[in-house]
Amino acid sequence: MKNQLFIYNTLTGRKELFQSLYPKRVGLYVCGPTVYGDPHLGHARPAITFDILFRYLMHLNYKVRYVRNITDVGHLTSDSDLGEDKIARKARLEDLEPMEVVQHYLNLYHKTMDALNVLPPSIEPHASAHIIEQIQLIKEILEKGYAYESKGSVYFDVEKYNKKYNYGKLSGQNIADMLNTTRKLDGQEGKRNPIDFALWKKASSKHIMQWISPWSNGFPGWHLECTTMSRKYLGNLFDIHGGGMDLIFPHHECEIAQKVASTGYEGVKYWMHNNMVTVNGQKMGKSSNNFINLEQLFNGTNPLLIQSYNPMTVRFFILQSHYRNTIDFSNKALQASKKGLSRLLEANNNIKQLTAQTTNSTVNIEGLRNKSIEAMNDDLNTPIIISYLFEATRIVNSALAKQTQLTTEDIQQLKDFFQLFLFNLLGIKDELKYKNTSYNSFAKAVDLLLQIRVQAKQEKNWIFADKIRDELTVLGFEVKDTKNGFEWKLSK
């Protein structure tokens, strides 16, 4: 079977065969968070999406340099060139230093990403640590004639750029329409056109974060950092740039313009974008009173939640939808994910109970594996892989019920199948095992109690046997008598 990965390229609007620029090496850049608030579902989705890509590329034996930036300067409250810096505003409101705000929310972000079992990137550069490089990039764009200085700020000349290149190539935006529909706003009087975007902004005396530049004391525009840092760590040409669909315009469109203006070429071979998260059918946002951060999800403290959901349930919920589809959060959907994941983990843990009953296989685990690889190669189709995991679960349950006979090879292939797809590639952790380092001792203690119960039943000491079962039930254990003795599991 050919193992060829196809990914959807936003730039071309079609799935394309992935071919790395350099043999067995991949450069991957993903836009990370602006760290001024609690990490939420909108942060989890791109992190998990590109974690899956990172894991699979490594599985395919690529050496991956994965760069995910941290925005800690330049992202204004309007998401364009107006308003206050989001981090500076938070610092002012809470009477903190800006880097205190950054460190606090970055720690929270790392904590939640670790809980979601998101692998750390190879490099996690901060925008504020690359001011010199950003100033150098501005100089290059000015020298090429695609930017202009105005009142201490520097703006990218979109109209001039578009005469030679195509501004809007990634997003499908038409510059003529933008020029006709974009009104001139207060605070943009230094621009030649309202659609021009800032490369450098002159700071007011009250602006907390500002640096010395050839044009003024100020700060870089939001779009500049990713062009600068991707170039520094991955070179002028690299394989994949990822992020949320909300970044296609203007952020990623502006990144392309900056790269082309400074170097003459686009610099990225594949653009990948994950879709958005909605809550009960509505866009998530504080103004809609449907904002749920990840800590609230994990501890159940948001009023929209009827219970808490552990991080692996949240990860599994996100992976049940293809990354390019919108995913709608609801308690009903999370509860279904919790139940489904529990079935898969239980089946995996039950494989150890299986024994070979035949030498002639009646199941095709290798076929499931091949179809799952095909699904991964088809633009990371995780929902299809999950459907095959449920198919493997049915085989395990059928074998436990003595309705299907398995060979020794079948049993090993089932173990390998769950290990590769559920744990290695989808990144699920069996939380029952990892939550408590003394799990094995705990399980042995339960087994010992149930062995004592079996002995009590053999001695017809029914009251004592029932007491053990009833007490375990109260503690959250589900006990089932079998022909071979007993089975148990945690029911809550």
UniProtKB/Swiss-Prot annotation:
Subcellular location: Cytoplasm
InterPro entries in alphabetical order: Cys-tRNA-ligase, Cys-tRNA-synt_Ia_DALR, Cys-tRNA/MSH_ligase, Rossmann-like_a/b/a_fold, tRNA-synt_1_cat_dom, tRNAsynth_Ia_anticodon-bd
E.C. designation(s): 6.1.1.16
Residues noted as binding Zn(2+) in the record, renumbered to the chain: C31, C226, H251, E255
SMART domains with a match to the protein in the record: DALR_2 (SM00840)
Keywords: Aminoacyl-tRNA synthetase, ATP-binding, Cytoplasm, Ligase, Metal-binding, Nucleotide-binding, Protein biosynthesis, Zinc
Protein name per its UniProtKB record: Cysteine--tRNA ligase
Organism of provenance: Azobacteroides pseudotrichonymphae genomovar. CFP2
Lineage: Bacteria, Pseudomonadati, Bacteroidota, Bacteroidia, Bacteroidales
